């Protein structure tokens, strides 16, 4: 794929960075309708991640539920994500899952980037790390807001992942608002993220 005003593909850009791999992460977090739950009190309840090639091919997958400590999962959140309180009652706490993610993030030592659809995931990881007093599980990787890059490449306002897939003619596979399924779908959009924007 060739982009206007650019002669290299996303894959070629990654190779210039001496890596053909990118870690794609999608989080689900506690939430409630309207202003029912302040942003600073939201907690990760699921982490989905995939290692993907610059072409969007998934190589490895990671998925874990996380037990929240501040608030139980609301009816609204359960309806949105399909994750029930019973699903997370026996799940590990964030520090344990963060350590698992840190290990998964080291599978491709040449990688330099991790991406998510928007900046929420990056901010929420930082928020939960601070809350639990643990280091970032992704210290060696720079965050890329793929939602912003997709929008800039098309000169449009930022759109949701489902809309982006529709715009490029790809199906939304799996369950929307589940970490691993969303991470897989975001990975499919990597070829439409122009390297000059990253």
Region annotations inferred by a language model:
Residues 27-37:
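Short acidic, Gly/Ser-rich segments with clustered Asp/Glu that frequently serve as metal-coordination loops
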Residues 24:
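Active-site histidine-acidic residue metal-binding/catalytic motifs
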Residues 80-100, 108:
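Metal-dependent phosphoesterase signature
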Residues 3, 11, 16-21, 40-47, ...:
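Metal-dependent phosphoesterase core characteristic of DEDDh/y 3'-5' exonuclease domains
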Residues 7:
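Single-stranded RNA-binding regions, centering on S1/OB-family and related RNA-binding modules
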């Amino acid at each position: 794929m060739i982009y206007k005003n650019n002669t290299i593909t996303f894959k070629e850009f990654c190779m210039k960075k001496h890596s053909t791999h990118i870690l794609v992460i999608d989080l689900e977090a506690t939430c409630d309708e309207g202003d029912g739950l302040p942003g600073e009190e939201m907690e990760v309840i699921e982490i989905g991640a995939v290692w993907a090639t610059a072409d969007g091919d998934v190589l490895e997958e990671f998925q874990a539920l996380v037990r929240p400590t501040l608030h139980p999962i609301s009816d609204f959140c359960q309806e949105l994500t399909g994750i029930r309180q019973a699903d997370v009652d026996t799940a590990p706490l964030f520090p344990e899952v963060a350590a698992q993610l840190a290990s998964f993030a080291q599978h491709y030592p040449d990688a330099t980037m991790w991406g998510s659809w928007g900046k929420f995931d990056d901010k929420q990881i930082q928020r939960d790390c601070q809350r639990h007093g643990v280091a970032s599980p992704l210290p060696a990787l720079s965050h890329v807001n793929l939602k912003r890059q997709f929008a800039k490449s098309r000169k449009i306002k930022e759109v949701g992942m489902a809309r982006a897939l529709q715009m490029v003619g790809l199906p939304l596979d799996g369950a929307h608002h589940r970490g691993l399924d969303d991470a897989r779908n975001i990975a499919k959009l990597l070829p439409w993220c122009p390297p000059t924007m990253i």
